[in-house]
């Protein structure tokens, strides 16, 4: 038998999954790693933590599965985007902890860049619809301006999954989907843009060679094979950025298909032969891992991670209870949230704890509970968070529908948030759209990475098998009464985004003790 391993390097940790040649997931293991926040707007992770999570999860996966290492023929990786891992000419890591996709430290570098290159032209060429400081090129410019000695030693700057690919094979490359988040990649030309590189002042040589997501970039080095417990002949394909791997795993293998991803961050994406670009509301676009296609999306940065923040700060007793009982703390949290009625008794939560998206009036928009009073209890707080996360994504869905009116009234939901029956119903009622859950929920990005490996290794001729793997397990239809409640709340939520953005801009200027700006 032939088997595949997929690594899904998410914001919260790495999930290793074992697939058979038909695309069935036989086993999976998750290893968490931390994000640190050294200053306001700085979000960092340690590349060594990613590697150790890959090593540990591989060992546990092999222990779970009754397969021989020699039967694993290929590996594919999905990785969170906009990474900037600096390597010297020997491949050595130059920074122990590196900015991740949500890190916004490079605002000054973005402003300097746009004094040389018009921002609208840059967006229309790149499709980079996140706030500009998040994109890789500006973070590299920050390295240059703030850590010149380290910057002078840089030979390559690569992303999350490409760093793991390098540790696996010794080869430094990227794929089209990950390169499309560099900030200097031209979507329609399918290459780095020389004019944007010139405006950045960055040497083209530090950006990795771009290859297809299904291309075999090498076999495991003897050292990597020994550390992982795998055979040295195991091939590694380039893989892709999480957005695009998830699109593939979520059945977006044809034009017009849409999915909603629920994780630490969330997004709604449509697949098309041409990128959906709008200079005013700026959807973000990544090249698909499938040749000739694009994924255009709007996202919400702090959705699932807001729920995790509530878990860590307001539900420590539930964490302990789940540990004692061998249960899932999120199940306990949603059971408690269900005791609060729709609308959380007038309590509204804004989940933008990591900053505003391109749809927000300001990147300095931050999270808030609104209308909190002494009559509210923890069940209201929890339900308000779940509803606020759904409200934020309703804004996303409305913006996408304005660009593509053909988006239908059924939506496939994938990712960790799709597991909760209550949350799926809240989404259905808030979106006024039917939510579908299939047999592939949290496995979508991993399935996409595995599919890249399957095609690259010659086990699959193409990606058509993806449709056969999905089996519909649940359908949540909107309730008209609850939808009317949420429509009323949505009007307040929209206004609150404006007001909170203004407050965020003002608070940024405050010299608060213990708060870095």
Describe each model-derived feature in a short phrase.
Residues 31-33, 212, 478:
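Active-site donor-binding loop signature of nucleotide-sugar glycosyltransferases
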Residues 5-6, 107, 114-130, 134-173, ...:
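Active-site core segments that coordinate phosphate-bearing ligands/cofactors
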Residues 63-101, 126-136, 165-186, 209-212, ...:
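Short beta-strand-loop/turn "lid" adjacent to the catalytic site in phosphate-handling enzymes
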Residues 1-96, 153, 222-226, 230-235, ...:
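N-terminal glycine/serine-rich phosphate-binding loop of ATP-dependent small-molecule kinases
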Residues 23, 46, 75, 103, ...:
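Residue-level signal for inorganic ion chemistry
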Residues 32, 100-101, 301:
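A generic structural motif
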Residues 46-53, 111, 117-120:
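Short, solvent-exposed cationic patches
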